[in-house]
Amino acid sequence: MVSVAEIRKAQRAEGPATILAIGTANPANKVEQATYPDFYFKITNSEHKTELKEKFQRMCDKSMIKSRYMYLTEEILKENPSLCEYMAPSLDARQDMVVVEVPRLGKEAAVKAIKEWGQPKSKITHLIFCTTSGVDMPGADYQLTKLLGLRPYVKRYMMYQQGCFAGGTVLRLAKDLAENNKGARVLVVCSEVTAVTFRGPSDTHLDSLVGQALFGDGAAALIVGSDPVPEIEKPIFEMVWTAQTIAPDSEGAIDGHLREAGLTFHLLKDVPGIVSKNIDKALVEAFQPLNISDYNSIFWIAHPGGPAILDQVEQKLALKPEKMKATRDVLSEYGNMSSACVLFILDEMRKKSAQNGLKTTGEGLDWGVLFGFGPGLTIETVVLHSVAI
């Protein structure tokens, strides 16, 4: 007779969850940040709001963003004028777009990740899909399963409406799935499309304008599994430890509400201040067991909610400017892509580490941290171990 303990042991993987491949995708439409205020105020018929446009121009100038990618083109917006008003009923039009585009963009990223992984897609056992862009049944996880031709008994997990911290959440869930299911190969997809949040400007809702200055579209996909197959699967990062916490006294700091007018975005408190005030505690909890207290000795992947968050974290921890280079580069080239951002930064870091001849995927360092920040205010922490190049 086999004991429950023996069954349990046989079900578990031996090694830590490992990122085995990364793929990214963006819509074809590239938007230059320098000229975006002119386009935005013209397409929303708001050119008469000159003071507001000047404020928006300053927001864009200070954003540290050079370009973004957006599904919404001038043609699409002209065909859907309700999206260009501030609070016009427009959810049907938005849903019609994102229900199709979110899985489609996710597929594009997933195909790249599967190709790099080098294994047949029939070996995918689990799928985690995350988006803050629209809600539907069956969900984007189901649609992606069909688009990719995955097996019908792939175990699916759909995460809707989590916001900007969710790039950390999907890694936390993927780690648990990979380590607790021997032989599991988890396809993780984050796909975000701003068609759900785009709206015209308002004098009375400046935090909405912040979102219009920062958000971009993108999808990222990973393959995660434990015990990589030698010579076939090539590890990129190992996931060692994860945590999620709600920052104290932060209720209402970041809110998003799905209404007839789409997803409205609200910043009600000093978000950079809340993050920087709580970052030290999160780092101590994560790295004290590793006897690491010098945070310049680790590599950094932080969700770039905006430049002010990165600036305050750097200042609080006395980080060297190069620590946030990969994070700032992704913010500059793509804007804030919500949950997909940290996965883009993982990809950027491993590529640049190889190009620069460094000895590990983590900028030549062994240990690193990935942070997600978002509604709640919720902080996701993932401790990563790099792999020798």
From Swiss-Prot:
Protein's UniProt keywords contain Lipoprotein: no
The main enzyme category here is: transferase
Instruction: Please give the catalytic activity noted in the UniProt record.
Output: (E)-4-coumaroyl-CoA + 3 malonyl-CoA + 3 H(+) = 2',4,4',6'-tetrahydroxychalcone + 3 CO2 + 4 CoA
- Highest taxon of the source? Eukaryota
Database matches in InterPro entries: Chalcone/stilbene_synt_C, Chalcone/stilbene_synt_N, Chalcone/stilbene_synthase_AS, Polyketide_synthase_type-III, Thiolase-like
Biological processes annotated in GO = flavonoid biosynthetic process; polyketide biosynthetic process
EC number(s) for this protein?
Answer: 2.3.1.74
This protein's pathway: Secondary metabolite biosynthesis; flavonoid biosynthesis
Q: What induces it?
A: By wounding and Rhizobium infection.
Molecular function in Gene Ontology: naringenin-chalcone synthase activity
What positions does UniProt annotate as the active site of this protein? C164
Matching CDD domains, A to Z? CHS_like (cd00831)
Entry keyword Disulfide bond: no
Identify the PROSITE patterns for this entry.
Answer: CHALCONE_SYNTH (PS00441)
Keyword annotations for this protein? Acyltransferase, Flavonoid biosynthesis, Transferase
Q: Which family does it belong to?
A: Belongs to the thiolase-like superfamily. Chalcone/stilbene synthases family.
Function of the protein: The primary product of this enzyme is 4,2',4',6'-tetrahydroxychalcone (also termed naringenin-chalcone or chalcone) which can under specific conditions spontaneously isomerize into naringenin.
UniProt cross-references to PANTHER family, sorted A to Z: CHALCONE SYNTHASE 7, HYDROXYMETHYLGLUTARYL-COA SYNTHASE
The molecule here is called: Chalcone synthase 6
Which species does this protein come from? Trifolium subterraneum
